[in-house]
From Swiss-Prot:
Mg(2+) 1 binds at residues 417, 419, 462. PANTHER family: BETA-GALACTOSIDASE. This is Beta-galactosidase. Its cofactor is Mg(2+); Na(+). The record marks 358, 392 as: Transition state stabilizer. The gene is lacZ. Mg(2+) 2 binds at residue 598. It comes from the Bacteria.
Length: 1024
């Protein structure tokens, strides 16, 4: 029977979820993950513990619009209309309530600590049995690894406790509540709590029991906490594993602790001691604690490059050796410190190749499983990332174990963000909110501090800078002086951070915002008195078709030692799968669930799609972050390793010399490069060239053998150099046949053999081509100066809030999208060996000329049409997105073949990873399926393009697909695109960069803007 004090009415009256001073009731203290092995060998080998039982699976569930709607009877028995849901899960992914995507704006009315009366409430219940032996002795705990956002727990009708902080565990002692036979849990989860004001991260707002639930049985006398640290001499040849162990229960003289250190099957060191430690103050020391030090000679050091893992087993036993219980953790011998303005790992300065990562799955919301976690780690390792920031909350506990073992440096971040407050530090400078903030920081440290992968603590994200931050910074530095602390809020260089950690600071451009100026990263280093390292906590906003200018950051990182890298925003698009009326899946973003407020597609900033398929930008990141750098001098290649600890032992350098994509010579050389060392490779003499073209040398570093994170044949680095400037685009000598010109009132028509070209005299455009009786064009060949806007072009502009500074708004206001061609000249001349068409167009909007385009088309007896284009840009119009030509071809061919940069999509400010070669891909692969459609699929540096019966030659950029720029511009989601008739071809003489320093302000560097007043390009169009 439910007691009065346990009743739902009492809980509702207290309203713990609207009291920042109440963050938990009856919750146990935080500690590292426990398993309570009763066999030390099982602890050493990390076998499943018989004392740890998962409660994941099917639970009964009922959703209510508010906690007051929950009937009291639910505490005792399931309701008749209960459904079944799987735990862990977000209830929004099961059709209850709607997920809300918002970045800054709170999804609730801002009135802390109060939340809406209509507060969606999920009521979970589970019936289970426990082992009889668990009831006879010891302590049985229930562990919730993550519940969003707050919950009350009952067991067998009796109230157990309360917890909040969605991203850290809540653990309760169930011993007094369990009974023999059947037991029933009831968990009331509230969508909103006062904790929601500290959880205003840029992500989907979801609810429920979304991480694992488990039971743990501990002995009455037990290990209650343990902490390991590694200490070194100056040259890292000797180490001490320092283990501090705390117990709970009856403190008996016969109790002992043994800590043993293992490397595989080999015991490296061991030590035993009774409880009781050093004197702390005049009252003595801790009787329930003991610290042991194990000496280790020549430890194998841990790093992301070589993640050597030991295993520490902590045994609580009696003096005669009878084991009471054992706990264990992985150990990595490594040292992190900041010295002389540099972040050092094991004495070496790190270069952080980092990425931010939200816990996100397109089908499961914020539920992470081991397969997805491993998939993400493999993606990072294979693409030369060595670090991850847990943005913006502590991750699933398993994540850290996997990072330890695969090798990633981790920034562990507290679940604190108050981005929507005005000012942002309104709560973080308020002492009433210090207890809530404190629990989120201190419990993170207590849970995760044994992980070697965690090299930096973060106090949270975008919460201004308040006195609470200063207090928590000092707490961490006192409790764990072995790691630096970072925090970006309040200007990225406050007293609460050991690292200057700005977000979206640019390489050379200052952003002098009031109170919190964002200096260029180069300038920041030179500020008076500033000696901290700089690591960007967020940079290179990878939203849609982005990451332009990424190479500029890496040039700076390699030039200035104290610029120690950064974390790209971010890894994974946060789109969610919805289904149409026919059951077909499609990718949804903010607003697609009827969610308000929402920030539309701003949730999709990933280097990979939500299903982990890579964006083309991922290849650029991989190339810029590669650990081998190359320098060519004559026939000598100098290979420099940026590895700090890895001596190349599984790398071959493959080299190829090719002329217009045709290999002339190749070879391979084993790499034997010491960490931070060099190797010089001499190439043989090249064969004599007997034809013209572009000569390129390409090198790839290939791993012949599989590793823990890559398959055999993995390419880790590459570089390419052009060896000769001998491209010839001159036309062949005059042919024997002469094309025939026919003039009518409406057209100029040129005929040659079975080919015809028709120019409309009223429009001045090439209106049709024939090969035999087959028409080749569905639309005329026209100038093109616009592109379907990128996310970076749109910025923060939207229908209800126009940003006049956004590129797309500037183009719209100037009339670029609405411009119409006025024909100024259209003439035809018969030459000795060719026909020459000359046209001049003025592209105008509302009587104003924006562009003047002068073109000549020279059709000779070989059937080649040489097109020369000269464009004048009005001085007072915005720089255009592109200067090129477009038409709709009648054919739909299966494949596209080109000689140029590829194979992936590339743009003028994102092409360092692309290689010059002859590429051949299916037409469908020339389109990049960004969830929010935009300009995509460009290939730069093209010398030859072949599609169907057509060939284009010159020096141009192109994209080709079934979708017009107009359709891409007008369509909100990729699944709504329809393949149009024929194929759309865009050939650009010049294309503006895409930017990517951020996505809310113009970020295309000046050198990649089309700022000149005149442009000239030419190409040849012929039929094969």
């Amino acid at each position: 029977m439910t007691m009065i004090t346990d009743s739902l009415a009492v809980v509702l009256q207290r309203r713990d979820w609207e009291n920042p001073g109440v963050t938990q009731l009856n919750r146990l203290a935080a500690h590292p993950p426990f398993a309570s092995w009763r066999n030390s060998e099982e602890a050493r080998t990390n076998r499943p513990s018989q004392q740890l039982r998962s409660l994941n699976g099917e639970w009964q569930f009922v959703w209510f619009p508010a906690p007051e709607a929950v009937p009291e009877s639910w505490l005792e028995c399931d309701l008749p209309d209960a459904d079944t849901v799987v735990v862990p899960s977000n209830w929004q992914m099961h059709g209850y309530d709607a997920p809300i995507y918002t970045n800054v704006t709170y999804p609730i009315t801002v009135n802390p600590p109060f939340v809406p009366t209509e507060n969606p409430t999920g009521c979970y219940s589970l019936t289970f049995n426990v082992d009889e032996s668990w009831l006879q002795e010891g302590q049985t705990r229930i562990i919730f690894d993550g519940v969003n956002s707050a919950f009350h727990l009952w067991c067998n009708g009796r109230w157990v406790g309360y917890g909040q902080d969605s991203r850290l565990l809540s653990e309760f002692d169930l011993s007094a509540f369990l009974r023999a036979g059947e037991n029933r849990l009831a968990v009331m989860v509230l969508r909103w709590s006062d904790g929601s004001y500290l959880e205003d991260q840029d992500m989907w707002r979801m609810s429920g029991i979304f991480r694992d639930v488990s039971l743990l049985h501990k002995p009455t006398t037990q290990i209650s906490d343990f902490h390991v640290a590694t200490l070194f001499n100056d040259d890292f040849s000797r180490a001490v594993l320092e283990a501090e162990v705390q117990m709970y229960g009856e403190l008996r003289d016969e109790l002992r602790v043994t800590v043993s250190l293992w490397q595989g099957e080999t015991q490296v060191a061991s030590g035993t001691a009774p409880f009781g430690g050093e004197i702390i103050d005049e009252r003595g020391g801790y009787a329930d604690r003991v610290t042991l030090g194990l000496n280790v000679e020549n430890p194998k050091l841990w790093s992301a490059e070589i993640p050597n893992i030991y295993r520490a087993v902590v045994e609580l036993h009696t003096a005669d050796g009878t084991l009471i219980e054992a706990e264990a953790c992985d150990v990595g011998f490594r040292e992190v410190r900041i010295e002389n303005g540099l972040l050092l790992l094991n004495g070496k300065p790190l270069l952080i190749r980092g990425v931010n990562r939200h816990e996100h799955h397109p089908l499961h919301g914020q539920v992470m499983d081991e397969q997805t976690m491993v998939q993400d780690i493999l993606l990072m390792k294979q693409n030369n990332f060595n670090a991850v920031r847990c943005s913006h909350y502590p991750n699933h506990p398993l994540w850290y174990t996997l990072c330890d073992r695969y090798g990633l440096y981790v920034v562990d971040e507290a679940n604190i963000e108050t981005h929507g407050m005005v000012p942002m530090n309104r709560l973080t400078d308020d002492p009433r909110w210090l207890p809530a903030m404190s629990e989120r920081v201190t419990r993170m440290v207590q849970r995760d501090r044994n992980h070697p992968s965690v090299i930096i603590w973060s106090l949270g994200n975008e919460s201004g800078h308040g006195a609470n931050h200063d207090a928590l910074y000092r707490w961490i530095k006192s409790v764990d002086p072995s790691r630096p602390v970072q925090y970006e809020g309040g200007g990225a260089d406050t007293s609460a951070t050991d690292i200057i950690c700005p977000m979206y600071a640019r390489v050379d451009e200052d952003q002098p915002f009031p109170a919190v100026p964002k200096w260029s990263i180069k300038k920041w280093l030179s500020l008076p008195g500033e000696m901290r390292p700089l690591i960007l906590c967020e940079y290179a906003h990878a939203m849609g078709n982005s990451l332009g200018g990424f190479a500029k950051y890496w040039q700076a990182f390699r030039q200035y030692p104290r610029l120690q890298g950064g974390f790209v925003w971010d890894l994974v698009d946060q789109s969610l799968i919805k289904y149409d009326e026919n059951g077909n899946p499609w990718s949804a973003y903010g607003g697609d669930f009827g969610d308000t407020p929402n920030d539309r597609q701003f949730c999709m900033n990933g280097l990979v799609f939500a299903d982990r398929t890579p964006h083309p930008a991922l290849t650029e990141a991989k190339h810029q972050q590669q650990f081998f750098q190359f320098r060519l001098s004559g026939r000598t290649i100098e290979v420099t390793s940026e590895y700090l600890f890895h001596h190349s032992d599984n790398e071959l350098l493959h080299w190829t010399v090719a002329l217009d994509g045709k290999p002339l010579a190749s070879g391979e050389v084993p790499l034997d490069v010491a960490p931070q060392g060099k190797q010089v490779i001499e190439l043989p003499e090249l064969p004599r060239l007997e034809s013209t073209g572009q000569l390129w040398l390409t090198v790839h570093v290939v791993q012949p053998n599989a590793t823990a994170w890559s398959e055999a044949g993995h390419i880790s680095a590459w570089q390419q150099w052009r060896l000769a400037e001998n491209l010839s685009v001159t036309l062949p000598s005059a042919p024997h046949a002469i094309p025939q010109l026919t003039t009518s009132e409406t057209d100029f028509c040129i005929e040659l053999d079975n080919k015809r070209w028709q120019f409309n005299r009223q429009s001045g455009f090439l209106s049709q081509m024939w090969i035999g009786d087959k028409k080749q064009l569905l639309t005329p060949l026209r100038d093109q100066f616009t592109r379907a806007p990128l996310d970076n072009d749109i910025g923060v502009s939207e229908a209800t809030r126009i940003d006049p500074n956004a590129w797309v708004e500037r183009w719209k206001a100037a009339g670029h999208y609405q411009a119409e061609a006025a024909l100024l000249q259209c003439t035809a001349d018969t030459l000795a060996d060719a026909v020459l068409i000359t046209t001049v167009h003025a592209w105008q909007h509302q009587g104003k000329t924006l562009f003047i385009s002068r073109k000549t088309y020279r059709i000779d007896g070989s059937g080649q049409m040489a097109i020369t284009v000269d464009v004048e840009v009005a001085s007072d119009t915005p720089h255009p997105a592109r200067i090129g030509l477009t038409c709709q071809l009648a054919q739909v061919a299966e494949r596209v073949n080109w000689l140029g940069l590829g194979p992936q999509e590339n743009y003028p400010d994102r092409l360092t990873a692309a290689c010059f070669d002859r590429w051949d891909l299916p037409l469908s692969d020339m389109y990049t399926p960004y969830v929010f459609p935009s300009e995509n699929g460009l290939r730069c540096g093209t010398r030859e393009l072949n599609y169907g019966p057509h060939q284009w030659r010159g020096d141009f950029q192109f994209n080709i697909s079934r979708y017009s720029q107009q359709q891409l511009m007008e369509t909100s989601h990729r699944h709504l695109l329809h393949a149009e008739e024929g194929t759309w071809l865009n050939i650009d003489g010049f294309h503006m960069g895409i930017g990517g320093d951020d996505s809310w302000s113009p970020s295309v560097s000046a050198e990649f803007q089309l700022s000149a007043g005149r442009y000239h390009y030419q190409l040849v169009w012929c039929q094969k």
